[in-house]
Amino acid sequence: MADSERSEAFGTPDDTPLSSNDAAELEQLRREAAVLREQLESAVGPQGTARSARDVHQLEARIDSLAARNSKLMETLKEARQQLLALREEVDRLGQPPSGYGVLLSAHDDDTVDVFTSGRKMRLTCSPNIEISLLRKGQTVRLNEALTVVEAGTFESVGEISTLREVLADGHRALVVGHADEERIVWLAEPLVAEDLPDGFPDALNDDTKPRKLRPGDSLLVDTKAGYAFERIPKAEVEDLVLEEVPDVSYEDIGGLTRQIEQIRDAVELPFLHKELYREYALRPPKGVLLYGPPGCGKTLIAKAVANSLAKKMAEVRGDDSREAKSYFLNIKGPELLNKFVGETERHIRLIFQRAREKASEGTPVIVFFDEMDSIFRTRGTGVSSDVETTVVPQLLSEIDGVEGLENVIVIGASNREDMIDPAILRPGRLDVKIKIERPDAEAAQDIYSKYLTETLPVHADDLAEFEGERPACIKAMIEKVVDRMYAEIDDNRFLEVTYANGDKEVMYFKDFNSGAMIQNVVDRAKKNAIKSVLETGQPGLRIQHLLDSIVDEFAENEDLPNTTNPDDWARISGKKGERIVYIRTLVTGKSSSASRAIDTESNLGQYL
């Protein structure tokens, strides 16, 4: 072994200065090591040297194994230490005393607050981490075991429902009526009285709970023990009866009613779009519109189109994007208003008009649409099993032209039994405009068919070949042929024979009872027949024959449907006026081969009423 290696083996660097004694001692140790090494080599011989090398390798391998085990043990101990720390934290957390909660009543300048907790009103201190200026009356706060406020929460979201009777003069208290008509005074939480809430609070409030002027009759969420009202709750019964939407229906979707559409646009859109002209001429806008006529002729469709068109026109006037036009169409489910409990129907009507006034106060047009108006507001005194109309009708009248005006609100009613509606509702000043939706004639029927038979529909190749592949010409010919067949005065189209009081007789055809709904049904039948034809023959496309067959099927299905007690009703339905009808006989020949049937004693109303 070289001297430098020996020096490194004994851990003495060459550049380290040594004293004379240390140098002598080191030199002596080197000589002894050399002697011992020579003795060892002479004792073991050549074979011993090889065995010694193997032992060294084994020892090195064992050292590596022990080092790896030691590393794993170190990692295990580290993980165990971390688990012990986590368990210690969990034990400390579980050992903490319980926290209490209370409702903040008021805050003071000396950093103390009044809190209602455990049925007591207490004055408590706040943790330095709490910013007292951000605390709001009625807010939930958390207390530690020393009854110190340590955390600010949100406003209470559960509790009892009470009805607001009135807001007191100070604006911070209210008289509410709870269960069993129990009256009490409660504080109003700041979301109910604040004009501007601080950052962080509006996020917890939806559109129905944002600050607005409270009105008598509002439902409030109340904590009777703390004496606070936290939130205004939307009335579920009104939500069930009212559908707020902007219908996706335009005037272009309606066929055959050009004159009626112009009338209702003049009655509804002009007053909203040109208010200054109405004021200049001292002209009062109409308060309501009645759409009446036979069923299936588009009364409800027109009402939806009015709401859509009015919203877009108002957006254009204001310079807003018409795609984001906003309007409210309150579609009232008429018969669901009726309730067996006395006064409930009237209350629902009040709530509906209250909702309409709230929406209209924003300057947005509101349309209140009563479908099947005759089911709710029938003539007073005509009730058989009840007299509910004697109070429901006056409630509607008081809402339309009572002390409270209806600004930006218009009422639209639809009915196919206008004779059953109370006359007081129909007088001028209430439902001013009355528009009759008549049955379509041949020209109107072509317009309606054009809404359903468009150029985008697949047409059979044979039919296209007749018009040299011109799809528009083929579609136009289809419409003309199907209208000619539907409105032809031929024997196959005869429906009823009516006898008048003077003895005269008249034949009524299916065209006298046609409607937009029937036309849509004919087209739907034809499309279904075209689909079946594709499945059977593999040849796609709609054919003229499909439409003609659908007309025959539609007429044949009506053979057993017409029935009425009063023959005069048929004259009203068909639009006939004049001589009284005393006898009716059906002339339908289709599915049944039996003789024609007289109608003068049957009791049920058919689909045409």
Curated annotation (Swiss-Prot):
Subunit structure, interactors included: Homohexamer. Assembles into a hexameric ring structure that caps the 20S proteasome core. Strongly interacts with the prokaryotic ubiquitin-like protein Pup through a hydrophobic interface; the interacting region of ARC lies in its N-terminal coiled-coil domain. There is one Pup binding site per ARC hexamer ring. Upon ATP-binding, the C-terminus of ARC interacts with the alpha-rings of the proteasome core, possibly by binding to the intersubunit pockets.
Coiled-coil features, chain-numbered ranges: 19-96
Protein name as it appears in the record: Proteasome-associated ATPase
Alphabetical list of SMART domains matching this protein: AAA (SM00382)
Phylogenetic lineage: Bacteria, Bacillati, Actinomycetota, Actinomycetes, Mycobacteriales
InterPro entries in the cross-refs: AAA+_ATPase, AAA_ATPase_domain, ATPase_AAA_core, ATPase_AAA_CS, NA-bd_OB-fold, P-loop_NTPase, Prot_ATP_ID_OB_2nd, Prot_ATP_ID_OB_N
List of residues binding ATP: G296, C297, G298, K299, T300, L301
Pathway of action: Protein degradation; proteasomal Pup-dependent pathway
SUPFAM superfamilies from the UniProt entry: P-loop containing nucleoside triphosphate hydrolases (SSF52540)
Residue span of region Disordered: 1-24
Pfam families xref list: AAA, Prot_ATP_ID_OB_C, Prot_ATP_ID_OB_N
PROSITE patterns named in the record: AAA
Species name: Mycobacterium ulcerans (strain Agy99)
